[in-house]
C-alpha cells in the first residue's frame, strides 16, 4: 500500500492505515519517508497541528491513467519510472549522535515523468492551503476535504488507539 523503504521501514506507531486513510506521524522526531504510487494516491493530502489549531491541505495535479513517475529511492534503479507521486518526509535524528536537520516534516508531490521534445511542456500544480481557526471550523474542513475528523487525526497515534484488533 505504501512505500516506506526510503530510510527503512516506518514503525507501526508512526504509520497506520484506518478505513482507507493513511496516517503518518509528522513530528520532526524520527527520520522517515513514505510514498504512494499514482494508483493508490488521491489528489488531496493534509496534516493537522492541534497546538497551533492549524490544518494544512495540499491539492495537486494527479492526471488519470498516468503511471510513470521518477523513482526517487536513493539507489540504482531497476525501474526508474516506477516512482511515487506523493511523499511525506519526517525529519529526525539519523542516529543517536547526529542532530536532525530541522526538526520539520514535508508534504511533497511530483509531476509525471515526461520525455519532452524541445519547447514542449507539462504542467503540475501543487497548492498548499493553511487554515487557522476554531476546532469546529477546522473539523468541518477536514471532514469535507480529507474525509476524516480532527478527533480521529489527534487520537490515531495515542497508545490507547493502537490496541489489538480484538479491542
List each model region and its residues.
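Extended, histidine- and acidic-residue-enriched regions that form the cofactor-binding/catalytic faces
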Residues: 136
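Short peripheral tails and domain-boundary helices/loops at the edges of structured domains
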Residues: 143-167
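A contiguous, surface-exposed recognition patch within enzymatic or periplasmic domains that forms
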Residues: 1-121, 139-143, 161
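Short, hydrophobic/aromatic-enriched beta-strand segments in well-ordered soluble domains
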Residues: 120-133
Amino acid at each position: 500500500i505504501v512505500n516506506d523503504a526510503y530510510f527503512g521501514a516506518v514503525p507501526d506507531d508512526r504509520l497506520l492505515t484506518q478505513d482507507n486513510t493513511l496516517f503518518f506521524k509528522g513530528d520532526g522526531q524520527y527520520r522517515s519517508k513514505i510514498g504512494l504510487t499514482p494508483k493508490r494516491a488521491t489528489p488531496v493530502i493534509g496534516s493537522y497541528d492541534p497546538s497551533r489549531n492549524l490544518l494544512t491541505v495540499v491539492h495537486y495535479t494527479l492526471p488519470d491513467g498516468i503511471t510513470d513517475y521518477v523513482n526517487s529511492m536513493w539507489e540504482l534503479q531497476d525501474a526508474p519510472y516506477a516512482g511515487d507521486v506523493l511523499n511525506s518526509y519526517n525529519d529526525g535524528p539519523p542516529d543517536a549522535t547526529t542532530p536532525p536537520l530541522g526538526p520539520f516534516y514535508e508534504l511533497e508531490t511530483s509531476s509525471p515523468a515526461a520525455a519532452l521534445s524541445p519547447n514542449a511542456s507539462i504542467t503540475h500544480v501543487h497548492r498548499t492551503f493553511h487554515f487557522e481557526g476554531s476546532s469546529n471550523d477546522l473539523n468541518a474542513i477536514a471532514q469535507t476535504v480529507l474525509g476524516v475528523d480532527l478527533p480521529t487525526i489527534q487520537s490515531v497515534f495515542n497508545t490507547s488507539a493502537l490496541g489489538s484488533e480484538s479491542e
